[in-house]
Structure formats: C-alpha cells, structure tokens
Amino acid sequence: MSSTMNPVAPTAHLASDVRAGRLDPAQYAKNFCDAHPPLNVVQANIEAERCYYCYDAPCQTACPTGIDIPTFIRRIADGNLRGAARTILEENPLGGMCARVCPTEVLCEQACVRNTNESKPVEIGLLQRHATDAFFEKPGTPLFVRAADTGRRVAVVGAGPAGLACAHRLAVLGHQVVLFDARPKLGGLNEYGLASYKTVNGFAQREIEWLLSVGGIEVRCNHALGRELHLDALAAEYDAVFLGLGLAGVNTLGLGEQAGVRDAVDFIAELRQAASPADVAIGRHVVVIGGGMTAVDAAVQSRKLGAEDVSIVYRRGQESMGASADEQSWAKENGVRIIHWAAPKALRAKGGVLRGIDFARTALEGGKLVETGESLALQADMVLCAIGQSFIATVLEDGGVQLQGGRISTDTEGRSSRSKVWAGGDARFGGRDLTVEAVEDGKQAALSIDRHLRAA
C-alpha cells in the first residue's frame, strides 16, 4: 500500500471502525490536492507545437460540443490564450470543467492523428485547461455581449451542465432566463458529483460565476420541480421551459437496510461540500459496488480519506465497465483493488454492525449473465453503492411529457412531446453520463428555443 495513504497511527482492529479524522492535516492536503496538475507555459507551448492543425480535424468531430480544437491550439502556440479561451467557451461555456473531467482519451484525443505513428495524441484536455485557466485568472473584458433584449422569458429547471449551457446561450441571444435548481448551489454534477481532487479551489463555482456574468439570468436555488415548481404553471408563465433535471433517483442493492451501506453519489457530495476532508467518516474496509466513473471516484477518495482496504466489485468483465481504462488505472495506482465477475448477494452484520458482504461469482452464458455457483466473501465496515441512477418521472406530475425508457423523450433538438417544453442532459432518453454531452444538449436546445420564439 502507498505510504501516502497510511493512517496517522494504527488502531485496534474493529470491523466497524467507521470514523472521520484518520489522517493528519498535511496528509489530507496532499491527498486532495489537484490530482492532474496543469501544464506550465513551456510545456503548453511544446505540446501545442505537436498539433498538425488538421483542416478536416477528426478531434473536432469527436468533441460532442464541436470545439474548433486546431484553432484554439494554434492560438496557444501563438501566445494568444484569451483567443484560445474564446474559441473554447463559445462552443462550451463549461470548457474549464470539461478540460478537467472529460474522458478525452475516448473522445478528441482518441481521434488525434498523432496516434497513428506515435501512439501518443496531442494532450488536448490539458491544453484546453491551460487556455481556460489563464482566462479565468484574468477575465478582463467580457468575451460575450448579450444581444438586444427580445422580451421573451424562459424557465430553465435544473442548473447542472445542461441547464447552465442552455441558460447561457439563451441569455447571449437576448432572452430573459430564470434558472431554477433544487439545491443550495448551482452546478449539478460538477458541484456535487465529482471527486474533490478533480476540481480544487472552488473552480466549479468560479466558472459558474463567469457564466452568469453575461447578464439576463436570474437564479433561484432551493426550487424543485414537483415541490415549489409545477410544469403546468411554468408553461403558463414562461414562453418556453427547458428541463435539465438530471437523475435524482438512486438504484439500490436490494439487500435490505443496513447501517454502513450508503449511496456513493451521496458520499461524494458530502465530501465535496465538507469544510475539510477530515470531517468525512470512512471505514477501514470499504467495498464499492459498480463499474462506472462514480465507483472509481468513491473508491479512490475512500483511500485518500484513510481507508486501508478498498475494493471495487463489478458483476461483469473489465471491458464492460463504464469507467474508462485511464480511470481504472488511476484507481489501481491509488491502491484500489478491482474485482470482476461478482454480484452482491448478502450483507453480513453482527449486533447491527456491518461486518462484510457476500458475492456470487458470475459469467456469461449465451449472452446472459449467470451465477457460477462459486462465491466470494469480503470484509467490509462500509459499502458504497454506485450501481446507477434513475429519472424520477413523478416530478412531471402527468404534465403531458412523454417518456421513453424511463426518461424524457425528445426529438433531435431537445423538444419534448409537450408544446413549449424542451429537455436535455441525463434526464433525456439517450443522454449519457458525460458533462460535455449535457452541455451540448443544453446548447442545442437553446438554439431550438430561440428559433421557436423568433418564429412565433
């Protein structure tokens, strides 16, 4: 095990030793610093010079928001960081966060032609961060100026990546936007759902402050659809409504209630909102169920909080995991064990205290997942569930919005079956759990809403 993760002092062996403050302050600071530091000026210039500036750039095609990647990299090479940032942010107003969290290895960097001969793409994500970081440190004059006020009002419900992108584009186009969110802070996944070491020093909120500075966006937090807000009332009051609700429902193990078992998303949110990581309790033996990015974030942060033994357990093989190969490698580098082909079957507790979790070994037979008859038992005083989330359709209150596969059905522009209502992000059928795709959903919906309002 890495020495950077060792507790301050050994404690008596207790299967239920779940507590905060396992490490000393210096170790917490080290563990939760920026996990992937930015390029310095020299590194950025060298990397920018590696770009071929392709005319028909496959990297741009692979970017869900269509950022003109060759242009922004050329501007970095020319020393024009503000121009580079503008090229990025005009297509992706959350370009700073996306530079930190995008799985570039399976998007733009995978498409880079440098892979053909060198097997090493241009580090597009780090270059994007270099440009946007420089801009946010010294924004100067506004990059974007609002068009003349159209007199139209649009309600945007949900201030995650899709809602923020939609609100920003609508405001730039001259519409008045009221941005609602159920939580005390804006940002959605970017604020509550990502590992703390991916976005340090409050960057998510700093980017949102810049996004709102364009003007024309009124913010109302602690307003949830189905609680303070109702779709019929919104449709009556506003000229258009965009639903960027995300996935608020949590899938459970179905093994009954047990202290020590909690949702991984809630665990990550608690850590992101904590004044200090020292305030967050963690077990000594942590098992994370799931195979996506959330599972990796929860597992790695468990190690960084001082857990001695952390395992990710996934019911299928490595190739089926939602977490990218880079994320899986990152987990292993941080001392996380990844176990494949095992499905949770029972929790073991004694005296109401979680002691472990039992698994059935699995395999594929005829394309179906089956149990092999073999078993696996792991010691655990904390189990984190990262087995997916679901859309809570009841918030729509039978408001005439058609669902498909449990999510909101839309056309290619984000229009729902109900007049005046658009949707995007994870709540839209076909949406993937990627910040950059949610941003594109919001942007395209805003353009569609704008066309609709101008034609009316």
How should each PLM-predicted stretch be described?
Residues M1-T150, V241-G260, A349-L354, A380, ...:
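Ferredoxin-type iron-sulfur electron-transfer modules and their immediate structural context
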Residues P93, G160-P161, K185, G292-T294, ...:
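Residue-level detector of alpha-helix initiation sites
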Residues H130-A148, E209-R227, V250-L305, L403-S417:
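Glycine-rich dinucleotide-binding loop and its adjacent helix/turn
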Residues A148, R153-V157, Q205-L255, A346-D358, ...:
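Feature captures the FAD/FMN-dependent oxidoreductase FAD-binding
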Residues R153-V178, A295-R303:
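N-terminal Rossmann-like FAD-binding beta1-loop-alpha1 element of flavoenzymes
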Residues V154-V156, V177, V286, V310, ...:
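Conserved hydrophobic helix-helix packing surfaces used for dimerization/oligomerization
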Residues Q176-L179, R183-S213, V219-R220, A299-A346, ...:
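Rossmann-like dinucleotide-binding cores of NAD(P)H-dependent redox enzymes
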Residues A259-G283, G367-R432:
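FAD-site-proximal beta/loop scaffold in flavoenzymes
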